């Protein structure tokens, strides 16, 4: 799980950013997983390349098949003045990420104008993926990008 999160974060840092400046809200951000059960990355502004999205989608599909953990990634240029943590929490609830009754969803949010990467786990994942591990993944990836 940690290696998958590290790969996703590294992808965010290594692929060129091609953002259009649009402010996204929880209401206007498309939930791509509803349209295609094998698509986990919401990248409406095209910030990540299609190859990066395909790679992340493939990894997250395998993760869900092996563990039942549903993970979605949202990559947007801006959420306005909204707080990343609150936005991520709202996405988890609005999109219904995770299995009902298990609350085992994970939302990973990248907001380029705020230089923010945020994890939000459902209650059912807090034992498997506590905040300390999420923070460790962020720090590890940030350190690798600085080198």
Which residues make up each language-model segment?
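Bacterial Sec-dependent N-terminal signal peptides
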Residues: 1-24
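A short, hydrophobic C-terminal helix/tail in secreted or cell-surface proteins
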Residues: 143-147
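Folded, non-transmembrane soluble domains that reside on the lumenal/extracytoplasmic side of membranes
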Residues: 20-142
């Amino acid at each position: 799980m940690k290696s998958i999160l590290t790969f996703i974060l590294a992808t965010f840092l290594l692929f060129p950013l091609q953002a259009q400046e649009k402010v996204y809200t929880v209401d206007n951000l498309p939930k791509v997983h509803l349209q295609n059960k094998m698509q986990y990355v919401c990248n409406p502004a095209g910030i990540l390349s299609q190859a990066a999205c395909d790679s992340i989608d493939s990894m997250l599909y395998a993760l869900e098949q092996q563990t039942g953990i549903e993970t979605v990634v949202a990559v947007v240029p801006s959420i306005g003045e909204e707080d990343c943590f609150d936005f991520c929490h709202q996405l988890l609830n609005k999109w219904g990420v995770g299995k009902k009754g298990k609350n085992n969803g994970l939302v990973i949010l990248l907001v380029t104008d705020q230089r923010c990467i945020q994890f939000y786990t459902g209650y059912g994942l807090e034992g498997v993926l506590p905040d300390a591990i999420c923070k460790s993944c962020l720090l590890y990836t940030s350190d690798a990008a600085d080198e």
